[in-house]
């Protein structure tokens, strides 16, 4: 009996192949960092391999002895499931910006592997500073280092009514994926007025001073930088 291609099996096999291709693309291009954290990066290569196997298996069984139809509901379902693949590949890569700040919670330190002893010693990073703001022990450890020089990178956010030489240096912290992103901010003073626009990425060097629940950096050097390849922090 002559075997023919099943529209349903071919379509689902193509869907698996499309998603597998997307995962391979994210893996090889490095764009996975725009969607997941380093903690959950394993999902990308695992998904690429498993979906490739699923696509090959489904397409291998797509030739059937009897004609099979593709119901309209199934066609719509496949189209909807394939839509994210089309959007991610068609649209230019984008990260969360200051526009999302009002829609994101502040960093609370859940799931953070930064202890007070880590904050008390070594070079201070943005994630150390963010973690210090989430608990009393961390803030106490940071206060003990008041006046030390730090270098932090982030994007510019200007608070309404703030002084012209002042910005909030901002980073998003992603624990699992970009959907759970929270924001961490440090107030930076002594910035050249009007030199930087909101969402510009900058590197700030200066002395750090915890003041109450806020952290301030008195900048001695500020310069523009390209957006990092991994713009989100992972605690």
Task: Give the location of each predicted region.
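OB-fold and OB-like single-stranded nucleic-acid-recognition modules
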Residues: 1-235
């Amino acid at each position: 009996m002559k075997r023919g291609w099943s529209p349903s099996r071919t379509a689902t096999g193509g869907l698996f192949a499309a998603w597998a291709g997307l995962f391979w693309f994210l893996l090889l291009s490095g764009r996975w960092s725009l969607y997941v954290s380093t903690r959950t990066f394993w999902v990308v290569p695992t998904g690429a391999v498993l979906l490739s196997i699923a696509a090959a298996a489904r397409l291998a069984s797509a030739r059937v002895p009897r004609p099979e139809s593709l119901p309209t509901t199934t066609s719509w379902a496949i189209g909807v499931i394939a839509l994210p693949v089309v959007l991610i590949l068609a649209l230019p890569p984008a990260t969360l910006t200051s526009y999302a700040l009002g829609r994101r919670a502040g960093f609370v330190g859940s799931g953070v592997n930064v202890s007070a002893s880590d904050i008390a010693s070594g070079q201070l990073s943005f994630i150390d500073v963010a973690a210090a703001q989430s608990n009393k022990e961390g803030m106490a450890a940071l206060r003990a280092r008041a006046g030390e020089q730090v270098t932090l990178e982030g994007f510019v956010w200007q608070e309404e009514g703030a002084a012209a030489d002042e910005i909030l240096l901002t980073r998003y912290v992603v624990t699992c994926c970009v959907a759970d992103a929270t924001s961490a901010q440090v107030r930076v003073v002594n910035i050249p007025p009007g030199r930087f626009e909101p969402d510009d990425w900058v590197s700030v060097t200066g002395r750090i001073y915890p003041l109450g629940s806020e952290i301030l950096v008195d900048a001695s050097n500020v310069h523009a930088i390209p957006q990092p390849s991994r713009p989100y922090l992972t605690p």
